[in-house]
Curated annotation (Swiss-Prot):
Coiled coil: none annotated. The keyword Protein biosynthesis does not apply. The keyword Cell membrane applies. This is ATP synthase subunit delta. The lineage of its organism: Bacteria, Pseudomonadati, Pseudomonadota, Alphaproteobacteria, Rhodobacterales. Gene3D superfamilies: N-terminal domain of the delta subunit of the F1F0-ATP synthase. Keywords: ATP synthesis, Cell inner membrane, Cell membrane, CF(1), Hydrogen ion transport, Ion transport, Membrane, Transport. Its main location: membrane.
Amino acid sequence: MAEAASISQGIAERYATALFELSKETGALKTLETDIDALKDVLAGSPDLGAMIASPVISRGDQAKAVAAIAGKMGLSPLMTNTLALMSEKRRLFALPQVLSALAGLIAEEKGEVTAEVTAATKLSAAQAKKLAETLKAKVGKTVKLNTTVDESLIGGLIVKLGSTMIDTSVKSKLASLQNAMKEVG
């Protein structure tokens, strides 16, 4: 299983690098970034699309038609549309989520940005998100893009993952620490 994951990651990185370099050469990085965000949203919102791109049962032709229709409807750039067509022709659409993630990473690196995965007990307000991004920027010296999710089981506080660093200030983890300390004493 790990081998299959590394193979699809390798495929994704090759497609992402090629698409990134072509977009960079043609000055279309902003368009590429817009396409990536749109595709991520569509994949997240449509389990059927995720199933279609991962299905080995659906023929290349049917996948190509579906991808062309979706790309046309979404107004994706010709470069992204052609890449999706090539991926469907080569039966590589299953790697699309990894391609999008790799592309987002390449673009962020190009822009000098880092992404922080933030899990909060409640939805962050715009002011809170801005303050957190500014604080993290001061810490790492780069522009920080927040990728936020809500997990009510945290009770309160945040979990911030930035690169290999994780900061857990959630009430849930504090209670777990307290529980462990009480077990040791009692």
